[in-house]
């Protein structure tokens, strides 16, 4: 018996390994069955695979709220239920209390206008173009040092030895925190991702999530106070002293922004770099073409974002009765914006499943669109471009014989957790 579309969506929600690795046929089938939108009982949301409809939602924040981008209310309930039980543990009571207070606030990717507009105005300067241009030599230097550690071996796990570390080192330097605590920051970041795309996290996972948020807030609250008294040229200082029309951000807005900078500043770029590495290790013709003409690398990065971006989909909730291409949608109903599917919509581009760096224009939505266009997209593109060039410098790059694909345990984020490769050993760089 063939599974229904909703059965297959339920399998995706349950993080079926086959669907996490390759959701493309499911998305094509949903698109074909949609007229023009498909309501999934399993997800409790309209599944949006159309680039046109997704764009329509993204440019209308008054109708489509971003208050719960990573889960419907139903899927948030298990986290709340576990939190209620965890609160009875004496050592976790204060952490849970703060968690509840944070959950009531909305910052950046959970905020809507006018709050979101005010927050973005205050924080946009943190990722201003001149700062990113000045970072390019530093990103290249960090990249070279990471490659130097494994280049003589002729073998590496490009995810764990490169894709994880490059964005983690860079966001730590931009924040202005000690690099000798990278493991702590990475642990926090990984825990922050626990509720993202796991419909039913365990109690232990929720405990780790709440504990890490508490520890993060304790640590960064001290640094924010220090930067208010003695500002530096770093992200913490930007956040600590940000104002709009003379009004400073609230403490929760500062902490929320810093948490999101840490998470988005490494998790999504790590997945992008891993996908780039896999493409280069499996497509020799493309690799040779890029190696011969490095001016093509930016277009390669854009096609990597379209073809296999780091975010599979995010939720929006209707603030009033509306419609999706003629399908009535009631106030309070959710829509799951499948960015990965919209980027392969045949209406957007011909032969969408082919990887083609000559696509122009490449109107992908890997970084979103409109009000919530990714604030850190410039940094991600910079790191991806440097990373792609570094991988092109690995002679005869191929997948290792013992490589087996493994993907993140999430239906929201999609990326490899390892990438074993081989190449001709390099004894000296530069």
Q: What spans do the regions from the language model cover?
A:
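Active-site substrate-recognition loop segments, prototypically the cytochrome P450 B′-helix/B-C loop
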Residues: 1-159, 171-186, 190-203, 207-211
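Conserved cytochrome P450 K-helix E-x-x-R motif and the immediately C-terminal K′/meander segment
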Residues: 24, 291-327
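Cytochrome P450 proximal C-terminal region
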Residues: 27, 381-430
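Conserved cytochrome P450 catalytic core segment spanning the I/J/K helices
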Residues: 128, 134, 210-270
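Cytochrome P450 catalytic-core helices
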Residues: 254-260, 266-289, 375-395
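Conserved cytochrome P450 K-helix/beta-meander segment immediately N-terminal to the heme-binding cysteine loop
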Residues: 340-362
């Amino acid at each position: 018996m063939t599974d229904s579309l909703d059965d297959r969506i339920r399998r995706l929600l349950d993080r079926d390994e086959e669907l996490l690795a390759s959701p493309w046929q499911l998305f094509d089938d949903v698109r074909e069955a949609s007229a023009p939108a498909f309501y999934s009982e399993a997800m409790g949301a309209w599944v949006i695979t159309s680039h046109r409809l997704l764009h329509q939602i993204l440019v209308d924040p008054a109708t489509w709220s971003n208050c719960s981008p990573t889960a419907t209310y139903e899927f948030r309930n298990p986290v709340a239920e576990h939190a209620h039980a965890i609160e009875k543990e004496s050592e976790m009571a204060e952490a849970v209390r703060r968690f509840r207070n944070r959950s009531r606030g909305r910052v950046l990717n959970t905020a809507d206008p006018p709050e979101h507009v005010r927050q973005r105005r205050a924080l946009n300067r943190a990722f201003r173009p001149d700062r990113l241009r000045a970072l390019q030599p530093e990103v290249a230097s960090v990249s070279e040092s990471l490659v130097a550690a494994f280049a003589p071996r002729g073998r590496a796990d490009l995810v764990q030895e490169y894709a994880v570390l490059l964005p983690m080192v860079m966001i730590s330097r931009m924040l202005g925190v000690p690099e000798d605590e990278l493991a702590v920051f990475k642990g926090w970041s990984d825990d922050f991702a626990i509720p993202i795309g796991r419909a039913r996290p365990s109690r232990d996972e929720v405990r780790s999530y709440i504990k890490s948020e508490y520890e993060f807030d304790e640590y960064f609250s001290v640094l924010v106070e220090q930067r208010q008294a003695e500002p530096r040229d770093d992200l913490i200082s930007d956040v600590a002293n940000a104002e709009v029309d003379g009004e400073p951000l609230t403490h929760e807005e500062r902490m929320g922004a810093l948490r999101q900078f840490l998470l988005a500043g490494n998790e999504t770029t790590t997945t992008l770099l891993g996908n780039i590495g896999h493409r280069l290790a499996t497509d020799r013709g493309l690799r040779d073409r890029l190696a011969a003409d490095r001016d093509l690398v930016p277009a390669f990065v854009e096609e990597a974002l379209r073809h296999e971006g780091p975010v599979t989909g995010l939720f929006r909730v209707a603030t009033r009765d509306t419609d999706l291409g003629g399908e009535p949608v009631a106030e309070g109903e959710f829509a799951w914006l499948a960015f990965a599917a919209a980027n392969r919509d045949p209406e957007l581009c011909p032969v969408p499943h082919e990887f083609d760096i000559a696509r122009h224009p490449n109107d992908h939505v890997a970084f979103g669109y409109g009000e919530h266009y990714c604030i850190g997209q410039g940094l991600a593109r910079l790191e991806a471009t440097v990373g792609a060039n570094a991988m092109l410098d690995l002679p005869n790059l191929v997948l290792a014989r013992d490589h087996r694909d493994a993907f993140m345990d999430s239906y929201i984020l999609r990326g490899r957790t390892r990438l074993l490769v081989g190449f001709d050993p390099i004894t000296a760089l530069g």
